[in-house]
Curated annotation (Swiss-Prot):
Catalyzes the radical S-adenosyl-L-methionine (SAM)-dependent two-electron oxidation of 2-deoxy-scyllo-inosamine (DOIA) to amino-dideoxy-scyllo-inosose (amino-DOI) in the biosynthetic pathway of butirosin. Its cofactor is [4Fe-4S] cluster. Changing C20A: Reduced iron-sulfur content by 50%. This is S-adenosyl-L-methionine-dependent 2-deoxy-scyllo-inosamine dehydrogenase. Pathway: Antibiotic biosynthesis; butirosin biosynthesis. [4Fe-4S] cluster 1 binds at C16, C20, C23. The keyword Isomerase does not apply. One of its GO terms (molecular function) is metal ion binding. Binds 2 [4Fe-4S] clusters. One cluster is coordinated with 3 cysteines and an exchangeable S-adenosyl-L-methionine. A second auxiliary cluster is also in contact with the substrate and is proposed to facilitate the loss of the second electron in the oxidation.
Amino acid sequence: MDKLFSMIEVEVNSQCNRTCWYCPNSVSKRKETGEMDPALYKTLMEQLSSLDFAGRISFHFYGEPLLCKNLDLFVGMTTEYIPRARPIIYTNGDFLTEKRLQTLTELGIQKFIVTQHAGAKHKFRGVYDQLAGADKEKVVYLDHSDLVLSNRGGILDNIPQASKANMSCMVPSNLAVVTVLGNVLPCFEDFNQKMVMGNIGEQHISDIWHNDKFTSFRKMLKEGHRGKSDLCKNCNNVSVQTEEQYDYVL
């Protein structure tokens, strides 16, 4: 039986205030919109608690988590149900004030990955410069030029489509994505939800992770057969080649 995922990304909301040219939000709309129902989030927490999940959990897919009205509730529930997990927030920083950072830290967030995206002046720069040492240590502050851009599974035409068809990918061996409506995806590149593996409202996430569809997909990607999947055949992302847990890839 395959080992359990060490990372889980939860789409607590679908909205983003930016439409960066290197993000699918600039060319398409998510199939699922809105915010996750707190009852569904609780279901996920109960399932992860039963697994004693101790990996990385983050609160995004292609949305900006600080726009989620229930973010504080979700972070608090995470700390309550899975205290050994590592809660991390990935954000564009536009709504991250010093007070907000401190509140979320008190609720359990261990790290903030803030990316200064292309476009409008970044408000967070001034906040970051004024942070005390202990708070600043919780922030990884990146410029968009630091990022290794992918074509998001072939969605973005403005990023080279050159396929890495024979290269392995360990993303579905390490990570699960849970969408606003509870659908489980095998990859953070699956913006259009081509590979739904199950739904946490209908099955335990462990059962979904170990089902035949997910297991076969993992094996295929480990062996480098990207060309057999519509999701992967045009993907140029080769950043995840090991089963090690990571916070971000440069």
